[in-house]
Amino acid sequence: MQKILIEGYDISKDNANPDIKEIRNLDHLPSAKACEYFIHAHGAEFFYQNSHLGLLGKIQSYFMPDPSYLSLTMSSNGGATPMLDITLLNKIQRNTPANQCNIVHIFSCCSGAAQHHLDFIEGNIVLCTYNKASDNNVTQLANSNYETRIKKHSSLIEYIHDNFHLLVASDFSISYKLDNEIYNFSLSSDNIKNMKSIEELPVFLYKEYGTFVKFYQNIYAKYHVSYPEIFNISIGTKPKGLTYADLVRVFTRALTLETYNFNKFSLSKIENLLHQKGLNTDFSVDQAIEQENFELLTSLLNYDNTNIQFYTINKTIDKGNLDILKAVVAHSTTKIESYNIDRAIDKGNLDILKAVVAHSTTKIESYNIDRAIDKGNLDILKAVVAHSTTKIESYNIDRAIDKGNLDILKAVVAHSTTKIESYNIDRAIDKGNLDILKAVVAHSTTKIESYNIDRAIDKGNLDILKAVVAHSTTKIESYNIDRAIDKGNLDILKAVVAHSTTKIESYNFNTVIKIGNLEMLDIILQHSYNSEELVTKYHNYTINNIMPEVNTIPTIEEDVSILGAEIV
């Protein structure tokens, strides 16, 4: 039979199997032949309220309520459309010839409710559901059932034979509606949850399987000729042999589903299940956190096979319940990973973050510091940088500079491991925020390099430049002076040549002459300079040689008279 995957609204499965046709639009359902359908959709139990009941009818319905319907959320024109199970199943059935039979699997919360009204479903159908009408399903378990069914080219009955133990734990139900006759078989995990030891399970499964064999053989004998595509194989009378690991999986699945559907009777069942050895409690712990059920969580954390995973810590952080978080991180198997710290930073709750970083396995990485800087919460950042494993890297300083928050930057540079690099100074210059720059250059490890001065000159901001050249480690090099001359900004040049370490070299004079700016020439000339050297170099020059770009003779005569140059 052709296998069809029907995905509801907000459901996306990675369907890598080319033999399975995937559809979202119910108008594209196949016709003219029966298929095996797999419906993945969000489901909810729905009770139809009959407003036309009289008083007696209302009293009767109170004590004997009508069975529920399944409401599925399907896609329609890009939006979500609630649809009753009867409507959806009949839409499938009406596309199928009357003498054929579809197989339909529903993987949704409350899928068992779809079994209640088969008498309203047209045609012939085999309906498989994977939990009780009142129970939520677990996505991972639904996917496991689906993947197990499609990975082999086996018949439905072979699938049930091979996975009977897990189907019992899932409260699996199967119904056959053939020629207007309905046959139903339902499995229940309740007995498993009350077992005292794992040794009871094989006996129970053997008995349940024997009951199912009789159920199937009865239908097979009656219908295998009329519906050979459904009854294409007889059932094996012996159940599949199970290993100890298989039995543990049964208990684990029962535990997971009971936790997900926790009610006032659940805790005693769960504590009974936890007497079994080797159960996987990952999903159950996650659900206890989701429910903020401290009593349930405590029972699960006390179980000797519980291991805290990194994603469990993330879930606890996201939940934001401090008591729940403390209980989880206190577990002996907890190991804080760097992405747990990131998650706590993103949460923005100081108490939550402190509970995480206080753990003995915490190690602050440089990207955690970046994350705290980006968050922009000073208390959060201080809690991170205060940790004993924190080491400030140069790119953390760059990140704080880029953030532009002075308090954030101060918290970073105040750390004992901070060392200001020359490119941090460049970054602060480029930022153009005077307070940010001052906080950087004020650090004890700051050393101004000549290329930092060039960067400040290029920036063209006088206050920024003054903050750089005012530093005690600043030494003006001749090429810094050339850079200031080339910039063409008088105030910038004045700030450079005014520095105590400035020494004008002859090529600085050459540079200003090439520029042809008399005001700059004045600034250079006014600086302490060896006049004798200048006269020796230029006494044979005409002013046309010195300043060919300038034509204002009176001004030139005044400005170069010190040179002893010949005016022509």
Curated annotation (Swiss-Prot):
This is Uncharacterized protein RP612. InterPro entries: SecEffector_AnkRepeat. It comes from the Bacteria.
